[in-house]
Amino acid sequence: MSKAGIKVIVQPSFWLGSPRTSVGTFKDYWEHMISFETKRSMEFNIDHYVCLSVNPKESTERPLALDALEAMAKYLDRERIVAIGEIGYNSINHLEDELFQLQLDIAVDKNMLTMIHLPHINKKDGIERTKSVLKSKNLLGLTNRILIDHNTEETIQKTLELGCWAGLTVYPITKLSPIRAINMIEKNGVDKIMINSSADWGVSDPLSVPLVAREMKKKGFSKNDIEKVTFYNAFEFFKQSAKFLWRP
């Protein structure tokens, strides 16, 4: 990643890959991201920041998810924590809804940026439910501080109409291909859209961002537009956090 030109990583809280058995597994994971992953990234001259949350995929176990949310509070003031996220929906149910709203409340109380996860199925329902929750929480006036991730062709216009930042996850097999992401950019412009990648439990490619930059160059996009969607839009979003200190 360093050799490919990546300078900064913002890592959101993910799910464990298998069912969690105790609050301690959340604590270990959060500390691992804050401490070990930051140190590891910096050894390769990459700055590293963290978004903290109980991930939507792990938000339905009771009382575990609520206990984890209580435990999360002591980590939020750590210097590398720049946002609450990912939060939102996986299966779209009332248990996920409860954790989503509680974590939105935390973001407001702590004046933190928010990263929202759209479900991988029923995305239209997911964006509509997300809009409804944001409206009920009186957050439609704060959408410049909200990133909605995992957009597709059927959600991106609604995300941008809300005034939120729109994440496009380029990921082999299950999410967007580079060409799908580029087609969405051609249709919707480059403002408030950011390309991101993943390195998780499935087939993934942490070099998806420079890959998209290369493919955009082949298609004749300007240097400015390429840099906006692969770097500067994300930079503009995250620098709203006082703890995001990296500068070009």
List where the protein language model places each region.
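Mid-domain alpha/beta scaffold segments of enzyme catalytic cores
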Residues: 1-110, 116, 121, 128-133, ...
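Short, acidic/turn-prone active-site loops that include or flank metal/cofactor-
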Residues: 13-16, 170-175, 199-200
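Short helix-capping segments at alpha-helix termini
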Residues: 42-45, 136-142, 188-189, 218-224
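Active-site glycine- and acidic-residue-rich loops that bind
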Residues: 58-66, 169-178
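Short acidic active-site motifs
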Residues: 154-156, 177-180
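Short active-site-adjacent structural elements
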Residues: 175, 202-206, 238-239
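Short acidic/histidine-rich active-site segments
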Residues: 190-206
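Mid-to-C-terminal alpha-helical segments outside catalytic/metal-binding sites
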Residues: 210-248
